[in-house]
Amino acid sequence: MTSEHPQMFPSQFETIAEAAERHDVTFEFVTGRLRVKPMPDGDHAEIVMWLIECCMTQRPDLRLYPGRRVLLSGDCRTKPDAVLSHRRAFAAQGEWSDPAEVLMAVEVTSHDPHANRCDREEKPVAYAKAGIPVFLLVDREAGAVTVFSEPGGGRYGSVVTLTHGHTVEVPEPVNVTLDTEVLKEFVR
């Protein structure tokens, strides 16, 4: 199955995803394929909380929303681990957020190799196609942080990867500096 021949219609996916959430299972629909998103573990939660603290300290005008669903173009529906947006950007919106409101999507890898491949390969393309300015990937398996920026033509023009322990500069419109030393505690 590809985006040219999806497994199902997006509306069918939305019905399945809504039912699954009631049973602690999260699905995503990326490039026309149904994906199971593993439930986050404690280390995952700590990384997301660390990012929330970093963003709130340096950019109090923005909010990092964990687990907000994003309606991407065509046959793509994702639930990033977090999205950075302006305060109240999602007020009066339903459960699926407009990607135009998202300044940065965040994914933290899990213990699932299929989900990790999706985070590393498919989601950068999906987020770039949607015009999300920055995609931040915290890769626990690789012990690295990758910042994707400058979306255009269905891909990110700038991709910078640094191992945990380095200072990571997240570019405009985010404009946040991350001291990733703490992430060494969470390498798998």
Model segments located where?
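Gly/Pro/Ser/Thr-rich low-complexity, intrinsically disordered segments predominantly at protein N-termini
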Residues: 1-130, 134-188
